[in-house]
Amino acid sequence: MGSLRPPQGLGLQWSSFFLGKKGPGLTVSLPLLASSLQVNFRSPRSGQRCWAARTSVEKRLVVLVTLLAAGLVACLAALGIQYRTRTPPVCLTEACVSVTSSILNSMDPTVDPCQDFFSYACGGWIKANPVPDGHSRWGTFSNLWEHNQAIIKHLLENSTASASEAEKKAQVYYRACMNETRIEELRAKPLMELIEKLGGWNITGPWAKDNFQDTLQVVTAHYRTSPFFSVYVSADSKNSNSNVIQVDQSGLGLPSRDYYLNKTENEKVLTGYLNYMVQLGKLLGGGDEDSIRPQMQQILDFETALANITIPQEKRRDEELIYHKVTAAELQTLAPAINWLPFLNAIFYPVEINESEPIVVYDKEYLRQVSTLINSTDKCLLNNYMMWNLVRKTSSFLDQRFQDADEKFMEVMYGTKKTCLPRWKFCVSDTENNLGFALGPMFVKATFAEDSKNIASEIILEIKKAFEESLSTLKWMDEDTRRSAKEKADAIYNMIGYPNFIMDPKELDKVFNDYTAVPDLYFENAMRFFNFSLRVTADQLRKAPNRDQWSMTPPMVNAYYSPTKNEIVFPAGILQAPFYTRSSPNALNFGGIGVVVGHELTHAFDDQGREYDKDGNLRPWWKNSSVEAFKQQTECMVQQYNNYSVNGEPVNGRHTLGENIADNGGLKAAYRAYQNWVKKNGAEQILPTLGLTSNQLFFLGFAQVWCSVRTPESSHEGLITDPHSPSRFRVIGSLSNSKEFSEHFRCPLGSPMNPRHKCEVW
């Protein structure tokens, strides 16, 4: 357990008082002053005899000197109190007034912060921000993403002569998406032709290609679908300097197995999903509903069978247990329903795969059971299911009728109100999702100041230092493990803003050289991108991982930690208000981007990240005593979050454990880093009218980052799929574990925000 800093500014130290600034000769020590006042005074008895011998003038002088000395002591005490309790000056700049207004508008000051800090911090924001039409959730992240979208729209619609070829391809892709006239002319034709090319779909017409293996290879290798299982290339967890083929469970059309298995609770969603399937079948020429619905029901039943053998995410958190490396030959024995060598060679062409190819499998039992399921299922149904995977992935690139079908299902699935969102928002999102690195340079030049990397690096350095200070005080960790943990923290690599290659036009064009976008053919461009991205994946198999390969594009409002690279990544999109603003008090910046940095850094030591060493290799580098102590510390957090609920539905403390550890550790590291900053730079000016200290502002700024609203349907989906806790409990859970928070807001022990029993890991 980390040692806690005593309260700042509470209580007085009577050993000395300082007049003005500290400096030589300006310190008056009370013990010395008291000693000087006793000079020439003897013991009480002798003093009484001396007093009687004094003349009346001497007696009056002694009394006068005593009174003057007492007055001097009182004045010094008053000056000391005034110095120690002096309120910092108020910031009245335009920026400070503006941020104060924003903070006040978000708050609900009628709520007791010690009872419900989330409502205190966000109550005003929630009242003023109902979920907008076309959305199922809304918050500060959404607001910033919309801001970034508007910037991207402007950049994509305004060509520049200096644009690289890759940037021009992104613009062609976007404009084809915006050409609604052409899309409406083509209607369903592009996808219907593709289905026919692949041998047909029994839902929409004659099924001519009774070849399970060929269909599986084509829909996987050329159109990036993942029926039955997913296949991809990534760093080998136990040999992080090498990439390796990885196979994992996949194949569900709904976000989680829970939707299929808890039928009563999710009946509305299951009915909506089936209706959506039927509607797409009709739009693709499937004839009358009586022939389509039974076949779609069979597909839904097959997905339910897949859900039954799918392992819940909360049981997959120990990566040491689920990691299995096999050869292609061993995989063939494990899951014989697939002819693996032709399948893998089709996906990774032109790379040659033989029987000795190493493959990492994350659930051997799932693959064994899915192979049995395939062998026992009718070939027509298997084809229908694989083609449904293709249709589900590609229908959004067709005309408005398909958009309407999507929106209707989204309303059932997420509670999204149907609305006519501007087409450009859909097209910006899709272009950024597929070609985000190609358009990255435009976004970076428009939004990312030259010194932003340096500023972010300084913040990361401060957070890292604070985290390591806390690490050094942990009582539950043995010294050898602590030393190795510090080495890992020191070795964490920072990636800020964007990968370097995107700012070099030649390097960027080289990456996108094999992708061509065609004017006015949106569906074709999307299919070409799917095929291109799989070729890029294949190209990585025989290469070592490198730090320029990011999992997020520059405009993304997010951040992440990569365990195999031991690196934290902060795209340019998140290095903006409300997370970071140059003109804001640093209390808000540390409470915003500082906590985000601390969160990602702590992921290196959560229940999954801690299993990787400083070089990114999965191996047991902790001593057993510390592993057991860690499990005890984290079990407290599992139980804490298990007790939270939304609309009567509980949070899964096991599934959300990694993110909860990161939330709590990130807050603690950022707070300590802010205290270090104040010690080095002095107290900040406070914001007007709030009546809050800078430390209180830190916690308020942290909480207001998470102000958000969700529909009931979206909340339900989040509880069963999202590894993060709901926003409300990301705030309440972390703050109620913080002793410093309770001290600064003076929350009574035993109040909701200051429980007697607190959980702490890092």
Curated annotation (Swiss-Prot):
It holds the Pfam family Peptidase_M13_N. Residues 82-762 are extracellular. Its cofactor is Zn(2+). Its main location: membrane. Residues 1-60 are cytoplasmic. The keyword Zinc applies. Its EC number is 3.4.24.71. It is found in: Cell membrane. Keywords: Cell membrane, Disulfide bond, Glycoprotein, Hydrolase, Membrane, Metal-binding, Metalloprotease, Protease, Signal-anchor, Transmembrane, Transmembrane helix, Zinc. GO terms for biological process: axon guidance; axonogenesis involved in innervation; blood vessel diameter maintenance; bradykinin catabolic process; calcitonin catabolic process; ear development; embryonic digit morphogenesis; embryonic heart tube development. Glycans are attached at N158, N179, N202, N262, N308, N354, N375, N531, N624, N643. Zn(2+) binds at H599, H603, E659. Gene3D superfamilies: Collagenase (Catalytic Domain), Neutral endopeptidase , domain2. It is an enzyme of class 3 (hydrolase). Homodimer; disulfide-linked. Interacts with PPP1R16B. Interacts with TSPAN8; this interaction recruits the endothelin converting enzyme ECE1 to tetraspanin-enriched microdomains and positively modulates its enzymatic activity. PANTHER family: ENDOTHELIN-CONVERTING ENZYME 1, ZINC METALLOPROTEASE FAMILY M13 NEPRILYSIN-RELATED. Converts big endothelin-1 to endothelin-1. This is Endothelin-converting enzyme 1. The gene is Ece1.
